[in-house]
Swiss-Prot record:
GO molecular function, one term: membrane insertase activity
A GO cellular component annotation in the UniProt record: plasma membrane
Functional description taken from the UniProt entry: Required for the insertion and/or proper folding and/or complex formation of integral membrane proteins into the membrane. Involved in integration of membrane proteins that insert both dependently and independently of the Sec translocase complex, as well as at least some lipoproteins. Aids folding of multispanning membrane proteins.
UniProt record similarity statement: Belongs to the OXA1/ALB3/YidC family. Type 1 subfamily.
Stored InterPro entries: Membr_insert_YidC, Membr_insert_YidC_N, YidC/ALB3/OXA1/COX18, YidC/Oxa/ALB_C, YidC_ALB_C, YidC_periplasmic_sf
Annotated stretches, region: Disordered: 45-77
GO BP terms, alphabetized: protein insertion into membrane; protein transport
Organism expressing this protein natively: Xanthomonas euvesicatoria pv. vesicatoria (strain 85-10)
Name the UniProt record assigns to this protein: Membrane protein insertase YidC
Gene this protein is translated from: yidC
SUBUNIT field: Interacts with the Sec translocase complex via SecD. Specifically interacts with transmembrane segments of nascent integral membrane proteins during membrane integration.
Subcellular localization: Cell inner membrane
Amino acid sequence: MNQTRVFLIFAWLMVAALLWMEWGKDKAAANAPVAAATQAVPAARDPDAAAPSAANVPSAQPIPQAGAPGTVPATSSTAATPAAAGAAPVVTLTSDVLRLKLDGRSVLDAELLQFPQTKDGTEPVSLLTEDPAHPYNATSGWASEHSPVPGVGGFRAEQPGTTFEMAKGQNTLVVPFVWNGPDGVSIRRTFTLERGRYAISIKDEVINKSGAPWNGYVFRKLSRVPTILSRGMTNPDSFSFNGATWYSPQEGYERRAFKDYMDDGGLNRQITGGWVALLQHHFFTAWIPQKDQASLYVLAQDGPRDVAELRGPAFTVAPGQTASTEARLWVGPKLVNLIAKEDVKGLDRVVDYSRFSIMAIIGQGLFWVLSHLHSFLHNWGWAIIGLVVLLRLALYPLSAAQYKSGAKMRRFQPRLAQLKERYGDDRVKYQQATMELFKKEKINPMGGCLPLLIQMPIFFALYWVLVESVELRQAPWLGWIQDLTARDPYFILPLLNISIMWATQKLTPTPGMDPMQAKMMQFMPLVFGVMMAFMPAGLVLYWVVNGGLGLLIQWWMIRQHGEKPSKIIQANAK
């Protein structure tokens, strides 16, 4: 397979992939409002108004049992106690990286203080929000069939005041809340924030000073009305996965997009040692229970809200006894190094390089190299260039093999033309004679294609690394490029990319190319240039450097194999 056809195949594969993603995104956007309007959960979804049946909260410690797929466990009235003096006041907790507004039961608003919404702005990203158009909350509460549990507004801060801030030099902020129920039952909830950490520790202690056993289970959920993204090939937010993900030791990493949220009837599954999360571009929220505690994992819809919930563990607390449960709530960016510090199996997959494990592994390896280059170069733009250079050096033997195969094929083009003239329209005899020639001269017709097929997964994985890595968000390179995730404001990199593609075409020998292929090749630089004009500068930088190095390698290989680059350019210009 000659070099031109290989390039053409690769180019059209890229265009086809981008068009397919664009079509899928537009189709999802058209269907999303209908799904939100038609899917609803039973009224028993609200744990403040309902709870599992007696069979689901036994006197021992198992969690509520899963029902049939797509259903919610049978429920009846909860013995929830109303707040003694109305809704609890909203309390603000502030660390160096987070500002949370909560009522003791729900985190109503979460601002990421080190991530401004815009490059030049000061307003931080609000990941959790009370915005009535797109509410997004994290909630943890208790449910029971017979025993009293805290309702909305039931938890109150133990300390006076509504604002708690981590002081300079302080590494932790601990804020306890308490619910005092009837008959001597109380639940103490403690929020712990740590400096530089996006995982919030939430510990509940059930203290039973009554004269009867207390039965109940904890639930933890994430709920949001998904934002309908503007769809476009140049919008990285629409490329990224948006939806729920969960992990179990048995099944591994799984995910469900918001547009497909109730496919296969949602989710009802008992899991020990997992986690559940809602993902969007660059950021995510997750509930991470204790490793040894089992929970019922539920995906459902509550009107326009998509809900991901953990139910359990369940407790029976004897009179005079105490029981506790603890979980982490992650609210923050997909920072690889901080996620690794949480030491949670499978949580690294929230950096969603691909739903396929092999591509995700390649992506993780590429980011590992990229991050180490950044630690040395202190600039993500130069780190991208360094990574492409290393990849090109590592893959040089494949590129050389690809070109040598193409050069060998070109040397036998006159003989192939003679065979075609000899056998005319007898395609069978022509193919037989061609294969005999290949066998005699030890030519592998796939020699130019196989190296490309090996390289493609690596470069596709690198593309997703650049799209998904929050570390590159609003990061500058040099001069006019002050944000690698925004488009080039002066279109310099896209124009360079067009020039490099044009030069590559002119340098590529094209003997025997039919007129249709030649016309298609002439338009390819322009097609790619238009697409690249509005893509993030970091991606275009990758393409420019990769294409430029490819051009240099091709020039070198042509000289090595005795062909005159100037003559090739003159021939292709005709």
